[in-house]
């Protein structure tokens, strides 16, 4: 080079930023590059060899991955506005930076269900959520990426995402639900008032079927000696219950004066059934009761002249009209 003033320009690599300039007093070991990649006004005199024009770079680590862990109370796989976050879920981030450095870090979801990994380098990562207690993963990919659950129910892991050094990922979420139960009591409504009176007995052996929103039978149960029945370990969702009413019983009167003691069944399309029951995550509804009362009976027959005295209606023996018949208690 001829003696003169020079500028040196460095190309800043992807994923890096310029290091702090001229730190310390030793010009041989510091960085001279400015934020735009230039070292300016280098003066060379005749015969000079300058070996201290240096450029230092540091990896940009300003990326973020995180979002939300929530309880999917209705089991639809969507973050509805009323559904709460879950605290204490273990979340693990694994992956590799663009330089090939492996990453494996963990955190715990906060009280509002949020979690996050900040100051990440550019790279490819995935997130794994670990279930605790009775939580189960909800169905993934049920709606847009901002509102769905991204965790594979079998592994707890999300898909891999590749991010730049400044990218902010706020859409890797995990939804959980817990199992629930519904049921209660079948009784003989002796006074037919539609309410469970303390002296009225239970009815054993009544078959009840749990029907899901698709119209399929999920499970069945028979009322026990105490009239109790229960459907347990249920997924959140909408259900109805159908009852097989014996011919010697009918549904009792509908009475809504006390919802804790009334009967919840009515005739729906010819079947004894409840209205739709919304079952939410981690709920117990022991208030679905069935009241039955004795069916009305009838007595009928023939009055005839048994001319031959054989006790059998024989052809030719006349019927008797206008005879008064009494029904007596015994």
Segments from the language model and where they lie:
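Acidic Ser/Thr-enriched surface turn/capping motif at secondary-structure junctions
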Residues: 1-69, 73-112, 116-226, 231-329
């Amino acid at each position: 080079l001829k003696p003169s003033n020079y500028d040196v320009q460095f190309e800043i690599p992807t994923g890096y930023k310029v290091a702090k300039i001229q730190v310390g007093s030793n010009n041989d070991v510091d960085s001279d590059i400015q934020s735009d990649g230039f070292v300016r006004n280098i003066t060379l005199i005749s015969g000079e060899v300058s070996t201290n024009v240096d450029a230092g770079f540091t990896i940009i680590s300003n990326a973020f991955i995180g979002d939300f862990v929530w309880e999917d109370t209705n089991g639809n796989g969507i973050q509805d506005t009323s559904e709460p976050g879950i605290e204490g879920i273990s979340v693990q981030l694994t992956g590799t930076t663009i330089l090939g450095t492996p990453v494996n870090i963990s955190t715990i979801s906060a009280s509002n269900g949020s979690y996050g990994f900040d100051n990440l380098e550019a790279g490819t990562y995935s997130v794994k959520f670990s279930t605790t207690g009775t939580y189960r993963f909800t169905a993934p990919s049920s709606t847009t990426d901002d509102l769905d659950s991204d965790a594979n129910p079998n592994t707890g892991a999300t898909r891999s995402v590749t991010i730049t050094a400044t990218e902010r990922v706020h859409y890797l979420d995990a939804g959980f639900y817990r199992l629930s139960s519904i049921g209660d009591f079948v009784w003989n409504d002796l006074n037919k008032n539609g309410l469970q009176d303390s002296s009225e007995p239970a009815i054993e052996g009544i078959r009840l079927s749990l029907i899901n929103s698709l119209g399929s039978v999920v499970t069945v149960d028979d009322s026990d000696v105490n009239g109790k029945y229960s459907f347990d370990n249920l997924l959140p969702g909408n259900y109805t219950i159908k009852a097989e009413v014996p011919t010697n019983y009918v549904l009792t009167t509908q009475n809504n004066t006390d919802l804790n003691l009334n009967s919840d069944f009515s005739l729906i399309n010819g079947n004894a059934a409840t209205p739709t029951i919304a079952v939410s995550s981690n709920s117990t509804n022991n208030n679905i009761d069935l009241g039955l009362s004795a069916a009305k009976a009838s007595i009928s027959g023939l009055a005839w002249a048994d001319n031959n005295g054989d006790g059998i209606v024989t052809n030719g023996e006349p019927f008797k009209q206008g005879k008064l018949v009494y029904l007596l208690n015994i």
